């Protein structure tokens, strides 16, 4: 790690300092300039990183997020910090408080969701609480008792409102809901979105990221914002969204995360004597969505695909999402071995030009690869963390350790960048990204 600049001790101290600097009191901004609010899956990963520092503060992070949960069970993808501007679209563009019957009374939120990684954060909080005294364990267990129903309602909403075809796969109505905003996965589906007349807007991201090659184009953004307008037209109603949205895609990666998270939450429920009916539902959803993921896979390689509901077409792309079955399991052994070889081979982690052996968001051999552009090529440390954690959970200790070691080598420059250029290691996007620091803290914790 020294060749990049910082020792493990120095890196952990810098990561902890960063999270303290981004702490707004009861929430952590995803990044101080580009993302000055709370993002849903960022908050879960931030809680993972806070847990080794302070179980109590990690609990506050998730409490704040769950306090913004919608009445139908949805956890919104943004909870806006009071008095903080500098992000578009903000509350005045979403208008969820005015238009959505299920929106929370207190916090201002967006009207879409993000990947359900929160059970993982709860598990890490409980894990770290066991290393401390009775008081800290009590804080974690009291949180679980208080928020168990919120977590189950969140999973129930995903399993019902977002499995619109009963396929065991989560349908997204906006690419932002995937967390992989401009991935090549969505190109064909976005091409069918026709942005009509809508109120003018100014992109705040260009004021922070001046190298526009790192960010989605203006024409892409028009489609993103038009989808928000479509949601507003139907008052963010679940049934109407399923019927009316121009963009409706079954996301195999989010579905795999959901299956995995259901199993994690079910195990937590069993260990903490939660209602048998909840645990049973969680296990059933885990199995249903695992089967839904496996049903998308290529017979030989095991690579997973998304599905465009609107045009009835499978979407095959050389992106990190093709490895969804490695998260949730369920593939026949030979297919799984083949998929692991692909993950570690020259199309992804083993590409000879990569500076670090971690998964790029899009394969360097793909025609869609762009080394500097967001989810079209760069390496995201939080994705390295997710695969490392999942591989450990699945009993692949050596593979998990390799990703951890390579991820730490990459992060040892101390920039805690949102993402990195895969060949040069140049930090890109937002600096001081909270979830990057959180991944480092968990790895070093």
Where are these regions (language model features)?
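Short amphipathic alpha-helical coiled-coil/interface segments
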Residues: 151-154, 279-297, 404-407
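Long, repeat-rich segments with strong aromatic
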Residues: 244-275, 279-285, 373-399
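Extended glycan-interaction surfaces of carbohydrate-active proteins
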Residues: 2-38, 65-108, 168-249, 288-379, ...
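Internal, well-ordered domain-core segments that constitute the primary functional module
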Residues: 114-188
């Amino acid at each position: 790690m020294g060749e990049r600049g910082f020792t493990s001790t120095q890196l952990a101290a810098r990561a902890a300092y960063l999270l303290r600097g981004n702490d707004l009191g009861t929430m952590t901004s995803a990044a101080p300039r580009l993302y000055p609010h709370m993002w849903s899956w960022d908050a879960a990963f931030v809680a993972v990183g806070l847990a080794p520092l302070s179980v109590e503060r990690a609990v506050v992070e998730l409490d704040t997020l769950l306090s913004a949960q919608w009445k139908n069970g949805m956890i919104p993808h943004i909870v806006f910090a009071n008095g903080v501007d500098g992000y578009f679209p903000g509350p005045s563009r979403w208008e969820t408080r005015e238009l959505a019957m299920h929106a929370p009374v207190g916090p201002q939120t967006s009207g879409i969701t993000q990947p359900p990684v929160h059970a993982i954060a709860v598990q890490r909080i409980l894990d770290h609480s066991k290393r401390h005294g009775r008081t800290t364990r009590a804080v974690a267990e009291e949180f679980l008792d208080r928020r168990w129903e919120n977590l189950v309602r969140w999973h129930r909403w995903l399993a019902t409102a977002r499995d619109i075809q009963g396929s065991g796969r989560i349908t997204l109505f906006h690419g932002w809901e995937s967390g992989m905003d401009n991935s090549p996965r969505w190109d064909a589906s976005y091409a069918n979105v026709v942005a009509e007349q809508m109120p003018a807007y100014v992109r705040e991201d260009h004021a922070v990221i001046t190298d526009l090659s790192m960010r989605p184009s203006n024409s892409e953004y028009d489609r993103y914002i038009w989808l928000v307008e479509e949601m507003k037209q139907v008052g963010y109603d679940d049934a109407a969204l399923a019927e009316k949205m121009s963009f409706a895609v079954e996301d195999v990666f989010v579905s795999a995360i959901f299956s995995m998270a259901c199993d994690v939450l079910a195990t937590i429920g069993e260990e903490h004597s939660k209602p048998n009916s909840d645990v049973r539902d969680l296990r059933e959803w885990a199995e249903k969505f695992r089967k839904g993921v496996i049903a998308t896979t290529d017979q030989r390689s095991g690579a997973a695909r998304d599905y465009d509901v609107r045009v009835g077409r499978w979407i095959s792309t050389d992106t990190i999402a093709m490895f969804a079955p490695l998260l949730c399991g369920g593939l026949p052994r030979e297919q799984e071995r083949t998929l692991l070889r692909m993950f570690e081979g020259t199309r992804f982690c083993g590409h000879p030009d990569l500076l670090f052996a971690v998964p790029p968001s899009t394969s360097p051999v793909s025609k869609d690869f762009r080394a500097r552009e967001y989810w079209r090529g760069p390496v995201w440390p939080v994705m390295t963390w997710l695969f490392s954690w999942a591989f450990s959970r699945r009993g692949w200790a050596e593979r998990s350790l390799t990703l951890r070691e390579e991820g730490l080598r990459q992060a040892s420059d101390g920039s805690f960048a949102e993402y990195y250029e895969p060949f040069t290691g140049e930090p890109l996007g937002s600096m001081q990204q909270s979830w990057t620091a959180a991944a480092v803290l968990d790895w070093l914790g």
